[in-house]
Curated annotation (Swiss-Prot):
Gene3D superfamilies: 3.10.450.10. Optimum pH is 5-6 and pH 6-8 for papain and bovine cathepsin B, respectively. PROSITE patterns: CYSTATIN (PS00287). It comes from the Eukaryota. This is Cystatin-C. The record marks 22 as: Reactive site. It is found in: Secreted. One of its GO terms (cellular component) is extracellular space. Residues 1-18 form the signal peptide. SUPFAM superfamilies: Cystatin/monellin. InterPro entries: Cystatin_dom (IPR000010), Cystatin_sf (IPR046350), Prot_inh_cystat_CS (IPR018073). Keywords: Disulfide bond, Protease inhibitor, Secreted, Signal, Thiol protease inhibitor. Ubiquitously expressed in normal tissues including brain, eye, gill, heart, gullet, liver, spleen, stomach, pyloric ceca, intestine, kidney and muscle. Expressed, but not up-regulated, in lipopolysaccharide (LPS)-stimulated tissues including kidney, spleen, muscle and gill. It comes from Paralichthys olivaceus (Bastard halibut).
Length: 126
């Protein structure tokens, strides 16, 4: 009987833990807004398009604890009518017409170390 109880209890304990320690966990976008803003700015500076892209929809936001925080953010991006070389404090809304907006999905990975005021874009897949 004892030999049967231990494996059953161990299995129940493992199922109850859910996510592994150190695995990415879903979080609210408000916890990763700075990381998302940073990633979008880097994305825009790295494209050859003359128009800015903005976030049309947040699909998923996760945080993984890795010598700081790694934010894994999946968003739908779309084109705005604002030119990159003319934007100062202009509000740039996404084109309403999907043919002009040309939406696409990106996953950004941003590494943050709160004790150092430094963000790094460590992954971008669009």
């Amino acid at each position: 009987m004892k030999m049967l109880v231990f494996p059953v209890l161990a299995a129940l304990f493992a199922v109850g833990l859910g996510n592994l320690v150190g695995a990415p966990r879903d979080i609210n976008i408000s916890e990763a807004q700075d990381a998302l803003d940073f990633a979008v700015a880097k994305h825009n500076s790295g494209t050859n398009d003359m128009f800015l892209r903005q976030v049309a929809e947040v699909v998923r936001v996760q945080r993984q604890v890795v010598s700081g925080n790694k934010y894994i953010i999946t968003v739908k991006m779309a084109k705005t009518p604002c030119r990159k070389d003319r934007v100062v404090n202009e509000v740039c809304e996404i084109h309403k017409d999907p043919a002009l907006a040309q939406p696409y999905e990106c996953t950004f990975s941003v590494w943050s170390r709160p004790w150092i005021p430094d963000l790094q874009l460590v992954g971008e897949k669009c």
